[in-house]
């Protein structure tokens, strides 16, 4: 290129730049050509990858910094498989966390700059204060916190019931009042049940309040009726006398519970009592009461009232009792069926409780009664398909057993908190009464 041409090009370029710099020009400004410093060529002291900066006292990459931030406090790793002689880099992956942490510490990484408790909500700093209430002050929950009368604590009263046991033994020794010639044991038990259930044609007394004397009369009546009923059981009479007493002591309250349910159902059917009342018999006298309004005096055995003791059991016992009575009304068991239900319930419970020879004995008695019940359905009732009826009978018994279990749990709870201040000469007899 000639000198004249170069001069022309230079002049032309200068004119163009002057036009671009003029205020009226709309052309864009030239780009910023500031020189950017070259990225640092330092490597991570831990893994020798390109470093990001200084983290926790060492020049590291972001990955190693995050690793140390995560595991710098716990330092809880599995032992090294190569005795702390791992190669630190294998295709970009550290195979041993323990050796990686040791390398971090060797190059001076520390936890001094770690930041903790940066969350706006810190439960550790909250002042959790339990309000000072009567429950927290006394150390007892409101469920069992009662206002017992002052001066109620003292020596326990002793109740001797040996006379009751002696009377039951005497009844068993005397046997049944009248010998009966029947085809099987179940029929004889049905006859005995009719004899001991007492009159059910009219009401003798309506009970509104009951105390120590009335409670012991009920217990005595139920225990003696059970003993008298067992005298109609020939196979039971052949057992050793000690075994008879042991079985009687363990089941008399179950007999009273199931028999009273059946008696109440029969009384409601005959309109002898209202639908919200229950019935029982004491000394051939029919007694009825409304459990919702019945006053029970427990001052002779406890420093708490009956209403206060209801806090030990939130289950609606009265509703459960109505369910059982209605189920018995729908079933309308015959005396043979009711006798079998009572025996099955009593023998099952006493066998489960006493085990050993008693369990084997009651299982044999149940087998005899089961065969008699089969003969009763097939030969007398002409009902060979009776499985549904058996299922309804066992459903009632199972419900009674569930109530019995709840009573035992409640009794254990009352024992822990020393609700009753009495001692009985035979505590096992009245455990679930």
Swiss-Prot record:
<dbReference type="GO" id="GO:0000978">
    <property type="term" value="F:RNA polymerase II cis-regulatory region sequence-specific DNA binding"/>
</dbReference>
<dbReference type="GO" id="GO:0005634">
    <property type="term" value="C:nucleus"/>
</dbReference>
<keyword id="KW-0238">DNA-binding</keyword>
<dbReference type="InterPro" id="IPR035500">
    <property type="entry name" value="NHR-like_dom_sf"/>
</dbReference>
<feature type="zinc finger region" description="NR C4-type">
    <location>
        <begin position="44"/>
        <end position="64"/>
    </location>
</feature>
<keyword id="KW-0804">Transcription</keyword>
<keyword id="KW-0862">Zinc</keyword>
<dbReference type="InterPro" id="IPR049636">
    <property type="entry name" value="HNF4-like_DBD"/>
</dbReference>
<keyword id="KW-0805">Transcription regulation</keyword>
<dbReference type="GO" id="GO:0003700">
    <property type="term" value="F:DNA-binding transcription factor activity"/>
</dbReference>
<dbReference type="Pfam" id="PF00104">
    <property type="entry name" value="Hormone_recep"/>
</dbReference>
<dbReference type="InterPro" id="IPR013088">
    <property type="entry name" value="Znf_NHR/GATA"/>
</dbReference>
<feature type="domain" description="NR LBD">
    <location>
        <begin position="177"/>
        <end position="433"/>
    </location>
</feature>
<keyword id="KW-0863">Zinc-finger</keyword>
<dbReference type="InterPro" id="IPR000536">
    <property type="entry name" value="Nucl_hrmn_rcpt_lig-bd"/>
</dbReference>
<comment type="similarity">
    <text>Belongs to the nuclear hormone receptor family.</text>
</comment>
<dbReference type="Pfam" id="PF00105">
    <property type="entry name" value="zf-C4"/>
</dbReference>
<protein>
    <recommendedName>
        <fullName>Nuclear hormone receptor family member nhr-98</fullName>
    </recommendedName>
</protein>
<comment type="function">
    <text>Orphan nuclear receptor.</text>
</comment>
<feature type="DNA-binding region" description="Nuclear receptor">
    <location>
        <begin position="41"/>
        <end position="116"/>
    </location>
</feature>
<feature type="zinc finger region" description="NR C4-type">
    <location>
        <begin position="80"/>
        <end position="104"/>
    </location>
</feature>
<keyword id="KW-0675">Receptor</keyword>
<keyword id="KW-0539">Nucleus</keyword>
<keyword id="KW-0479">Metal-binding</keyword>
<dbReference type="GO" id="GO:0008270">
    <property type="term" value="F:zinc ion binding"/>
</dbReference>
<dbReference type="InterPro" id="IPR051152">
    <property type="entry name" value="C.elegans_Orphan_NR"/>
</dbReference>
<dbReference type="InterPro" id="IPR001628">
    <property type="entry name" value="Znf_hrmn_rcpt"/>
</dbReference>
